Amino acid sequence: MAETNPELSDLMAQTNKKIVPKFTEIFPVEDVNYPYSAFIASVRKDVIKHCTDHKGIFQPVLPPEKKVPELWFYTELKTRTSSITLAIRMDNLYLVGFRTPGGVWWEFGKAGDTHLLGDNPRWLGFGGRYQDLIGNKGLETVTMGRAEMTRAVNDLAKKKKMATLEEEEVQMQMQMPEAAELAAAAAAADPQADTKSKLVKLVVMVCEGLRFNTVSRTVDAGFNSQHGVTLTVTQGKQVQKWDRISKAAFEWADHPTAVIPDMQKLGIKDKNEAARIVALVKNQTTAAAAAATAASADNDDDEA
């Protein structure tokens, strides 16, 4: 008899498992009396309850990352006319998907992938990496702010189906006589571009705002600006290296004076500078190692 793959079994079970978030934070996006900074501070405070302290690391360390996430939280972004709920992993602060007012969950990924969300989610048709969302552009090209978040929420809340390139071409063929020429032009376009643009704004403002002190401060400073706000080129590069900065924090915990070349390229010379930039550190221990440590502690009465 073939042995079952525990990870695969867990993933399959997750498909039918209803997520119970540890908390839900509501942000009234258009309320100018409710600062973005207060929203981020409140979510961070709740996330930190599930973090641990690590000797030599100034920042709270997130729970160990697992193949099948166990800890989740929701953020409900509400405008005057609509709302969406973001499902975010506690172990790495990744946005996995969002729920519309109609109760439909949209998840990053495509047919053939394994769902992490319950309640019969639908695939967005693309992944959640920055490469998937903005291609080779830098994060300094992403405009954010209260108005941008409002538009993103209102537009995403209306999403009812995944627009595919084929669907776009068929619609044009039915509506316009010069369809052949237009369809050829459409083939070079991305019918999901607008959805991706809205989602990347929310990913940076919410997820990166939680991870990075620099991001939350920058966004907060220009959140009410009519022209929006953007990150600097350096901040954008740091955001895309959050995992590596987290690894460096663990390295500096063991070797405080270590010189880490790739951190110097990001303008981060030591753990003090890293703590100024990063608010929450990704756990660098594997789930297996964490389980082994826990088992060892359970079997040893002298363990603290």
From Swiss-Prot:
Main subcellular location of this protein, as a coarse class: cytoplasm
EC number: 3.2.2.22
Alphabetical list of Pfam families matching this protein: RIP
Alphabetized InterPro entries for the sequence: Ribosome-inact_prot_sf, Ribosome_inactivat_1/2, Ribosome_inactivat_prot, Ribosome_inactivat_prot_CS, Ribosome_inactivat_prot_sub1, Ribosome_inactivat_prot_sub2
Localization in the cell: Cytoplasm
GO cellular component: cytoplasm
Gene3D superfamilies on file: Ricin (A subunit), domain 1 (3.40.420.10), Ricin (A Subunit), domain 2 (4.10.470.10)
Broad enzyme group: hydrolase
Active site residues according to the UniProt entry: 208
Any GO molecular function: toxin activity
Signal peptide, first to last residue: none
Catalytic activity: Endohydrolysis of the N-glycosidic bond at one specific adenosine on the 28S rRNA
Expressing tissues: Accumulates to high levels in seeds.
BP terms from Gene Ontology: defense response; negative regulation of translation
Keywords on record: Cytoplasm, Hydrolase, Plant defense, Protein synthesis inhibitor, Toxin
Subunit description: Monomer.
Entry function: Possesses features of some constitutive defense agent. The coordinate Opaque-2-controlled synthesis of this protein and the major seed storage proteins (zeins) may provide the germinating seedling with both nutritional benefits and protection against pathogen invasion of the surrounding endosperm.
Name of the protein this chain belongs to: Ribosome-inactivating protein 9
Organism name: Zea mays
